[in-house]
Structure formats: C-alpha cells, structure tokens
Amino acid sequence: MPEGRIVLAATPIGNLGDASARLRELLAEADVIAAEDTRTARRLCAGLGVTPTGRVVAHHEHNEAASTQGLLDQVRGGATVAVVSDAGMPTVSDPGYRLVAAAVSVGLPVTCAPGPSAVTTALALSGLPTDRFAFDGFVPRKDGERRRWLTSLLTEARTVVAFESPQRLADALAVVVEVLGAQRPVCVARELTKLHEEVVRGTAAEVHAWAAERHAAEGIRGEIVLVVGPAAPGAEGEASEADAVAEVAVLVESGTRLKEAVAAVAGAHGMRSRELYQAVLAARG
C-alpha cells in the first residue's frame, strides 16, 4: 500500500498566473482535496484547466474538529490529501493547523507545496524592515481590544502584519494614530496581485488621511493587509509618567479594566505596574 500524506497547497491570492505546476499536479492527482470552500476550490480547478480525479470535501473552521479524523483515516489508508484554503497558504489565519497538529501527533506524513501568501507579499512590498516581523491575524474588531492590541505595539521592535476589513480600515488607522503616534510608519496593501492592486505607504497620519478620504468618497473595497513598522529605537521607557497615565485613561474609557490597562501600558514602557497604578489613582484625585 502506498504511504498516504497530507500536502498543504498554497493557492493564488488573486492572480491565477501565480499557480505553480506543482499545485496543478496536486489538484489533478490528489485522492482528496480538503477545501475551505468546495465551490471556491472547484472554481480554482476550472480556472487552471484542472479536472480533479479525487473527491473535493469541505474542511473549514465550522467542521474542522469533525472532519479531521476522517481525513487522518484517509491518509492511514494511503491517500494523498491536498489541503487548500480560499487563497494563500493553508493554516496561516486559515483552517488546517489543527489537522497538521493531529497528523504530527500520530506520526502521519505532512508536507507542503509552498506558494503565494498575502502576509509575506504585503511585508515585502511595505518598504518596512523585514528581518524581524510578526503576524497578528486580524485586527481586533472591538475598540477596547483594538486599543489594547495597539498598546502592546508601543515598543514593538518588529514589523507587525495583520489583516483588516475594508469597512473598518479608516477607523483602525485613526486609533493607530492615537495610540502609536502620527509618525509611526505604516503600509496598507489592498487587492494584492489583482487588477486593482494598491499599496499605500507613509506615516500613520498620512495613511489614515488617505483611508479617511477614500472611505468618505467612494468606500474602500477588497482584501486589506495592514503593516505597522517597528517602534523607533529607544522607544521603551521614553513615555513620561503623565503620558502613561493618559494612555491608561484611554484604555479605561474604551472598556478595559483599570488593572489590565495599567499592566498593558506599564509593560509597553518598561515601568513598574504598582508605581503607575498609584500615579493613575493620584491623577484621579
């Protein structure tokens, strides 16, 4: 019996011309194609001129727990299971990592057919440092959670990449300006590799001004990747006590508990939480 395996197969993020020969071969010959959306997978195959010989089955966040065991059983039986997301690399903010973890835990083979990724494409185009970076998934939706996330980046020495919805982009950038400062370097990458690809680079204030104007005039559409540059060297500890107290107040007003806000701001600036807490209480009178 041939040895089964799982293959994580990266798919184009917008331009079908980026599909590799290996991806075409996998889609044509895999025994099973585990797809985030079976309709999207079938459209991809049609666009590439590929006729799958295997079954196309759903494997997404809502059925991942249930479908994982079935896919592992197929691999045990000698099947090649190709895992594809709607766009880009499976497991990167997409379904698949639980399947990989489960396969690894029982010793089943897992390999990868690498290819396009919105994360690394946006990073490369941003013009921001690429030697150290972090991917933070999606920008938090709720204002308080978003502010806490941005507060954690006050002294972040790495470039940070995150996904954002076009409808929330202008509001998110306004909070970037408020929390990280108008001069923090930022990049917004929209519709990467597609016909209307757009990359906007500048300070947080400049990019926010672009987003606010575009949102008001015609709306912002398409897939968005937000890239936030690292803090300026020596940023840690630069904030005065008054600045830190003000940052705590902003977080508390947005719904963060006082002790959590103090811990976040103190950690970002290398301050002692107890001393900052006392300063906040003193400022409140």
Please give the residue ranges for each predicted region.
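Class I SAM-dependent methyltransferase SAM-binding "motif I" and its flanking Rossmann-like core
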Residues: Y97-E156
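Glycine-rich, flexible N-terminal cofactor/catalytic loop recognition
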Residues: M1-H60
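Short active-site oxyanion
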Residues: L27-I33, G107-T111, T159-V160
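General beta-strand structural signal in soluble alpha/beta enzymes
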Residues: E36, V110-G115, A162, V188
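A contiguous loop/helix-start segment that scaffolds small-molecule binding in enzyme catalytic cores
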Residues: E3, A79-T80, T159, F163-G285
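Acidic/polar, glycine-anchored loop/turn motif associated with catalytic or activation segments
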Residues: V83
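Conserved helicase motor
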Residues: V57-A66, V139-K142
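Short Gly/Thr/Asp-enriched flexible loops that form oxyanion-binding sites at enzyme active sites
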Residues: T91-V106, L173-V177
